[in-house]
Amino acid sequence: LAAIVSGQAEQEFDLGWNINTRGSWGLFEAIRSQGDSYCPRVVFTSSIAVFGSPFPDLIPDDFFTTPLTSYGAQKAISELLLADYSRKGMVDGISIRLPTICVRPGKPNLAASGFFSGIIREPLNGQEAILPVDTDVRHWHATPRSAAGFLIHAAELDTSKLNNRITLNMPGLSVTVQEQIEALGRVAGNDVVKLIKHQPDPVIKKIVSGWARNFSTKRSLDLGFKAETTFDEIIQIYIEDDLKK
């Protein structure tokens, strides 16, 4: 998983490259230095940030990567590095492009996508949440529970089934911010929804405007990866797994 997330990688250029890209390359080189007899499975957690607009309504695995953030570029480069080390037989690699993970537990981090979780997590904990974008913004989500499942399944998957195309879009759910808010109202009531305060942030809006919104995940679904199908379910999973723990 990324050590330097999207918003911070954009603000601290050198730090993002040193940790996210050089860190990945350093791991691959450390494995290679062990010799030909050592070829471990490496599951790389990539991101939908490798894609940038313009893009089709449904983005397939093989759509070209045009990241519009430093974080996305760092992830795309690491995907290519892993593919080459895998091609050379130095590692047995698979890259999984995670949706934005929602609802993230704990305190907010510096990810530009953090508000997608914040507008659910904070109100459910009785706290005010700031919404920095318009409610018609559409995005791609999956829960921490699904992300853990993706990683375990990727670690166990027979990679010969990938036919050397080792990068996969993970399943997820495409919803607007408005649909998130409506789901929160159904699950927790309108008093909770009233804790969301709209406060536009032009920096966040610019970053989010270049992000992908929906994906074709037939390959990953056919390979047995699974995710949620409604945002109500995403909220319920947060309540079950993380609320006030």
What residue ranges belong to the model's regions?
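Conserved Rossmann-fold NAD(P)-dependent oxidoreductase catalytic core, especially the SDR/UDP-sugar
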Residues: W25-T69
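Mid/C-terminal beta-alpha module of Rossmann-like enzyme folds, strongest
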Residues: F150, A154-V208
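NAD(P)-dependent short-chain dehydrogenase/reductase
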Residues: A83-R138, P144-G149
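Amphipathic terminal alpha-helices
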Residues: H198-P200, G210-D222, T229-K245
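NAD(P)H-binding glycine-rich loop region in Rossmannoid oxidoreductase-like domains
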Residues: L1-I19
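Substrate-binding strand-loop-helix patch
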Residues: K107-A112, T135-G149, N164-L184, I237
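Active-site Tyr-X1-5-Lys
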Residues: S53-F55, L68-I94
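Conserved cofactor-binding/catalytic machinery of classical short-chain dehydrogenase/reductase
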Residues: G23-G26, F63, T69, A73-S78, ...
